[in-house]
A protein has these predicted regions:
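N-terminal export leaders
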Residues: 8-13
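Hydrophobic ligand-binding cavity/cleft-lining segments
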Residues: 17
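N-terminal signal peptide c-region/cleavage motif recognized by signal peptidases
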Residues: 20, 24-25
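N-terminal secretory signal peptides that target proteins for export/translocation
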Residues: 1-7
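Non-catalytic cap/lid and distal C-terminal segments of serine-dependent acyl enzymes
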Residues: 27-358
């Protein structure tokens, strides 16, 4: 998949807010519990970064008793740099086991993992003329395609959107855009309160020192572009494309946070904040309906402080919808499967498991 294969996953995970075709369906021997389904990606065709439009989703369907009448779907959004492709290996087996365990306890859930990466690793699951329309791709293409494929048209309450890190942000942000499409959100260590989670990253010297010439080479057409030599630059390029596009008349272009002299551009930062879920909730805390269930978590020792913004968001929306916050032990990317399963148990109003002894 072109640029995607060049991503250094381990470095991205360490530096970022991160975790982190076939036709029809094919069971992969590397992870027999997941199937790969190719989505045409019509809404990504002609995207300004030249990224692939056709992508695969990873789908796990648990084994169910015959009398099970309904199978709900969890649309899972991985963290920055992650995608469905990660779930065709060892990582997928752990999630498959967790979802089979939930099904065995009377919580029948199909897990769908999407691929919304771009040239720099992650789209933040947003529509932007600097990268493409990834929220529309998820809402208007992936979900309808799969519901038709499986023959299971769903009511909004049959759909749960979930994610970790940038994917947790994406789950919240997409649900805010289209609250009528989902019944619940499970957001693990989401990118909330950018002053805490994002600003320390963009204030690093390596970001301040990017020159206009370097920036131009990074955003050049695929056949001419240069790959950033530092993974943090690559991440901030992706965040900039998501949060600060120049507009539809300049596809693929975005505003940088520093001018040619390295001076902070406050108006560009304000563009970023316009997408911050905490900022959005302060303006309008009635984002979700009373029937929605919003589960937020953040690690006790989260390296990016994601638990802080999650608590703020909880307090803002709590008077108007059902919301829960859980501070999990460990760091940003620890115990993801257990944390996700606990969030889903809360959605189903079941007894909550302990996570890391808590």
């Amino acid at each position: 998949m072109g640029f995607f294969n060049d991503l250094s996953r381990r470095a991205v995970l360490a530096a970022a807010l991160a975790w982190s075709g076939f036709s029809g369906a094919t069971c992969l021997t590397a992870a027999p519990h997941f199937e790969a389904i190719s989505i045409p990606g019509r809404l990504l065709e002609g995207n300004p970064l030249g990224d692939p439009s056709q992508r695969r989703v990873a789908v796990f369907t648990p084994k169910l008793p015959r009398f099970t009448s309904k199978l709900l779907t969890v649309y899972y959004l991985p963290g920055y740099g992650g995608s469905s492709e990660d779930f065709f290996g060892g990582n997928g087996e752990h999630f498959a086991a967790a979802f089979q365990n939930l099904a065995d306890k009377g919580m029948p859930l199909r897990m769908v993992v999407v691929d919304c990466r771009n040239r720099w690793g992650g789209s933040q699951y947003l529509n932007s003329p600097a990268q493409g329309n990834y929220a529309d791709y998820l809402l208007e293409e992936v979900i309808p395609f799969l519901e038709k494929y499986y023959g299971t048209p769903a009511t909004p309450r049959d759909r749960i959107i979930a994610g970790h890190s940038s994917g947790g942000f994406g789950a919240l942000r997409v649900a805010m855009m289209a609250p009528e499409r989902f019944g619940a959100v499970v957001a693990l260590s989401p990118d909330t309160d950018f002053e805490v989670t994002h600003k320390p990253l963009v204030e690093e010297h390596v970001i301040k020192s990017v020159t206009p010439k370097q920036l131009a080479s990074y955003v050049a057409p695929p056949e001419l572009m240069l790959k950033p030599g530092h993974n943090l630059i690559q991440i901030v390029l992706g965040l900039s494309a998501a949060y600060a596009p120049k507009g539809p008349n300049e596809p693929g272009e975005f505003h940088w946070l520093y001018d040619e002299k390295g001076n902070w551009q406050a108006e560009v930062w304000q563009n970023w904040l316009e997408e911050d879920t905490v900022v959005i909730a302060r303006r309008n805390p009635h984002l979700f309906m009373p029937y929605h269930k919003i589960y937020l978590d953040g690690a006790e020792h989260d390296e990016f402080g994601a638990q802080k913004g999650a608590k703020v968001l909880r307090d803002l929306i709590k008077p108007y919808t059902r919301v829960e916050f859980f501070e999990s032990p460990g760091g940003h990317a620890d115990l993801i499967e257990d944390r996700l399963a606990r969030g889903l148990e809360w959605v189903f109003e079941r007894k909550l498991r302990t996570v890391g002894g808590r």
